[in-house]
A protein has these predicted regions:
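Single conserved hydrophobic/aromatic residue that forms the stacking wall/gate
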Residues: 1-7, 11, 289-290
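Generic structural signal for well-ordered, non-membrane alpha-helical segments
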Residues: 5, 11, 33-37, 57-72, ...
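Internal maturation/activation junctions in enzymes
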Residues: 8-24, 28, 50-142, 214
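Catalytic alpha/beta core of large soluble enzyme barrels
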Residues: 12-15, 111-116, 125-132, 137-274
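Contiguous, well-ordered alpha-helical segments that form the cores/surfaces of helical PPI scaffolds
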Residues: 31-46, 62, 144-147
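Catalytic phosphate/nucleotide-handling subdomain of diverse soluble enzymes
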Residues: 47, 57-59, 63-71, 150-166
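Cysteine-cluster motifs in flexible loop/terminal segments that predominantly coordinate metals
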Residues: 277-288
Length: 291
């Protein structure tokens, strides 16, 4: 309940003005939130899963079901305490329609639709008492916040164990969390032979999210003949994402085969030498809290 309650309080405070009255009116009456994941790659690695493992799809399905269920439950409870958002009656939620009612049924080919929570009781409570927010879940890139929290970017596989990110104060080196004992569990983006596993992970997430997730497609030319990505591969990815219910896509990443001009092994050894394995996740050189 903490994220939805904290985010809801933002509407109490006037942090900035609105360019037009219509924007202010809609914002305050809809009270839309967009809460999402950060560090999914780390979560899968901790559970010994790779993006192309069918067990990873089930794990992500269960995680996202719980995530959306408790977001709705929290917003419903806030509505009981403080009242529903003014535009609640303009949402599908007011009609008793939940994300589990509208997802592409093809997703059931990835993970069977065996739900673990009491959605029907929640549905009844929502139609009776409403929601404090018109929307709740959305997936952000979290490029900057992942640095502060020492997490992998949003729902994306890391491009390497050590990456260099630009900031106003110069380049920052960031190592994946728990590298010493999870390095063999991570899915590395440019080592992926295809996008199939990633596409399915995002698809089972979209089943529960109430706003569109913008996923990415990534290609490493080294995995293809003559270092050229066939158009047929890209077209197949496009059709597959549509089949499984993606709403939007964002980037089409291609490995340009250029390094970040750092010796990855040497840099990793230097960073890891500054703290023990037990201290790794809290080590200052790895947490990269940059003020």
């Amino acid at each position: 309940r903490i994220p939805s309650s904290a985010a809801s309080d933002v509407y109490k405070r006037q942090y900035q003005g609105y360019p037009v009255k219509a924007a202010e009116n809609s914002t305050k009456k809809r009270r839309s939130l967009g809460i999402g994941f950060i560090g999914l790659a780390h979560y899968l690695a901790k559970n010994g899963e790779h993006y192309d493992d069918s067990s990873a799809w089930q794990l992500t399905h269960d995680l996202t079901e719980a995530f959306q269920y408790y977001l709705l439950k929290s917003s419903n409870q806030l509505a009981k305490e403080k009242g529903k958002c003014e535009y609640f009656d303009r949402t599908k939620y007011s009609q008793g329609i939940l994300p589990i009612d509208t997802y592409k049924s093809d997703v059931d080919e990835i993970v069977p639709n065996n739900l673990k929570y009491d959605w029907e009781s929640l549905r009844t409570s929502i139609t009776t008492h409403g929601l404090r927010h018109s929307t709740l879940s959305a997936q952000m890139p979290s490029e900057s916040s992942s640095i502060v929290s020492n997490a992998t970017n949003g729902i994306e596989p890391p491009r390497d164990y050590l990456s260099v990110k630009k900031s106003k104060k110069g380049p920052l080196k960031q190592i994946v969390p728990s590298y010493s004992y999870l390095k063999n569990n991570y899915t590395i983006l440019w080592e992926m032979k295809n996008n199939d596993g990633y596409i399915k992970v995002i698809s089972v997430m979209q089943k529960f999210f109430d706003q569109a997730i913008s996923g990415n497609w990534s290609y490493n030319p080294e995995h293809f003949e003559d270092n050229e990505v066939p158009v047929s591969v890209m077209a197949n990815d496009l059709l597959t994402t549509y089949k499984y219910g993606w709403k939007t896509s964002y980037y089409q990443n291609t490995n340009d085969l250029k390094s970040d001009e750092i010796d990855v092994k040497e840099s990793l050894d230097k960073l890891l030498g500054e703290c023990s394995v037990e201290q790794e996740d809290d080590c200052e050189s790895l947490s990269l809290i940059h003020i």
